[in-house]
């Protein structure tokens, strides 16, 4: 499928979101990813293709890619993505992946590290949009206190009392004690990790 860059947004920390309009409505499930192709000059060893989670929920109507950028250390692909002009197109294949919620009545523990929050954003917004229950304990670790999507997550947590969120900033760890403390009242949760 062909994707046209419609907008970009600087997120918390060193993350940027890119918003693409697909040439045809892709049928994806929240949590899935696409395989993106971005030809560019002098590609490094990693080449011109990357996999990124679709950070947007299907109802949002556009494909959102959110990724981190590190000064002068990023791949040539990421630099080409960062410099892509509005209106430019790239190719994508997919969607793929089974990192999806098949039973919204089940209780989940989502563990996110850094930019690994992207599939959880899509999943939580999708559940809310469809009016489905959100029985989730989210543990979100990051190297600093600039958590991507924090305001969106907090807004959801205010609306859904069954969404519990705990943040951990390096050097703090999401360890067994943290997990047990957060899920002490949950019966047989399903654990998902990303990042």
Predicted regions located by residue number:
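Ferredoxin-reductase
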Residues: 1-88, 142-144, 154, 170-171
């Amino acid at each position: 499928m062909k994707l046209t860059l419609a907008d970009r947004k600087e997120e918390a920390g060193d993350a940027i979101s890119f918003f693409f309009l697909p040439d045809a409505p892709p049928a994806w499930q929240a949590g899935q990813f696409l395989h993106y192709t971005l030809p560019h000059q002098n590609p490094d060893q990693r080449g011109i293709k990357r996999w990124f989670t679709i950070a947007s929920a299907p109802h949002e109507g556009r494909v959102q890619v959110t990724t981190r950028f590190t000064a002068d250390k990023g791949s040539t692909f990421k630099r080409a993505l960062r410099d892509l002009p509005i209106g430019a197109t790239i190719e994508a294949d997919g969607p793929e992946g089974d990192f999806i919620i098949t039973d919204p009545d089940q209780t989940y523990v989502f563990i996110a590290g850094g930019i690994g929050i992207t599939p959880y954003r899509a999943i939580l917004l999708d559940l809310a949009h469809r009016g489905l229950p959100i029985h989730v304990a989210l543990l979100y670790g990051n190297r600093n206190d600039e958590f991507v999507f924090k305001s969106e997550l907090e807004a959801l947590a205010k609306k859904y009392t069954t969404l519990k969120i705990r943040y951990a900033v390096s050097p703090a760890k999401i360890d067994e004690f943290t997990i047990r403390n957060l899920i002490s009242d949950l019966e047989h949760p399903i654990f998902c990790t990303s990042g």
